[in-house]
């Protein structure tokens, strides 16, 4: 809840401030495995410009909070994909881009993973073969909406404790400084 008081100051909660920051500065790491990766690169270029949405691609999973899997995932790549997912700090989200990443695509074989959601949790599915840049942008907007609505669930207890402390004391004072 954001409110503006009579002096023109904006007041909000720490939780809402962090939600706003998280959803407006998504840093994805990409797993580009097929033709979907070409469309993803096209989306990041000047015509569609993902930077205007706060999306800045990262080279390291340790600096990213979104994993975009674009293309066919074969069984030999699956352990590496899981490792990349595990290296990402929490909170983290996953976008499955295209029919191949979402359900195996036209490759129902023993060597193809029939959906990324079999090894990591997926937050947004983007259909298409390959999806258009507009589809990827729509998927990112859906992820931003999801972050706004759900918040950062892992830290909900921390926010609840913090907000209770503020309400109890009237102002936040670190526990070790209380007299």
Curated annotation (Swiss-Prot):
Topology term for the membrane: Peripheral membrane protein
A GO cellular-component term linked to this record: plasma membrane
Origin: domain of life: Bacteria
Uppermost EC category: translocase
Enzyme Commission number: 7.1.1.-
Note describing how the cofactor binds: Binds 1 [4Fe-4S] cluster.
Pfam family, one: Oxidored_q6
Known catalytic reactions: a quinone + NADH + 5 H(+)(in) = a quinol + NAD(+) + 4 H(+)(out)
Record PROSITE patterns: COMPLEX1_20K
Cofactors named for this entry: [4Fe-4S] cluster
Binding site for [4Fe-4S] cluster: 35-36, 100, 129
Subcellular location: Cell inner membrane
Keyword Repressor carried by entry: no
A GO BP entry: electron transport coupled proton transport
Coiled-coil regions listed in the entry: none
GO MF annotation list: 4 iron, 4 sulfur cluster binding; iron ion binding; NADH dehydrogenase (ubiquinone) activity; NADH:ubiquinone reductase (non-electrogenic) activity; quinone binding
Entry-linked InterPro entries: NADH_UbQ_OxRdtase-like_20kDa (IPR006137), NADH_UQ_OxRdtase_20Kd_su (IPR006138)
Family label: Belongs to the complex I 20 kDa subunit family.
Protein name per Swiss-Prot or TrEMBL: NADH-quinone oxidoreductase subunit B
